[in-house]
Amino acid sequence: MADALDPAQMRTYFVLTEAVSLLQYEVRQQLQAEGGLSYVQFEILAKLSEAGGRQLTMTDLADGVVYSRSGLTHQAGLLEREGLIVRHVSPDDQRATVVGITKAGRARVAKVLPGHVRVVRQLLFESLSAQDVRALGDMMSRARDHMRARPPRSAAPRKRSAGSAD
């Protein structure tokens, strides 16, 4: 059996996961109520908005969004049906699908962003000093970078369902 976490590690782990869970719950409620969006849909739209008019590949999105490839494809399909994004085969690589945000997608982000900022500010940042925010950001960046040092999930082989032919 692996060594147990020490009490400080265990406390930190549980405090972190509880804080993230509480924040995610409120963010999800706000995004759904104000924009009819799931968190993953908002994340896709926000990443495309931040791309400054540049289109991203589905692989780029999958590597930047913590979500399964199949789930991401499904969420992108829902956004496309709503006219919030467009997808097409890359002219540079026929194997790649590129994604861009539409005017309606930008409008949806603009609609939910003020409430999103309000929720995050109230729940996460109100109780922290500017120094705390910098320190937390530094610590979480190191932890995230350590976790992301492994190959991206998009590079992992796809799991085959039972009974599929090789």
Can you name each region flagged by the protein language model?
Residues 1-35, 82, 162-166:
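N-terminal leader segment of winged-helix/HTH proteins
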Residues 1-5, 130-166:
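C-terminal regulatory/oligomerization modules of transcriptional regulators
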Residues 23, 27, 65, 108-127, ...:
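Alpha-helical linker/hinge and terminal dimerization helices associated
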Residues 25-70:
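N-terminal helix-turn-helix DNA-binding core of bacterial DNA-binding proteins
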Residues 58, 76-77:
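Short, hydrophobic-biased segments on the C-terminal half of alpha helices
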Residues 77-135:
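Charged, amphipathic alpha-helical coiled-coil/dimerization segments
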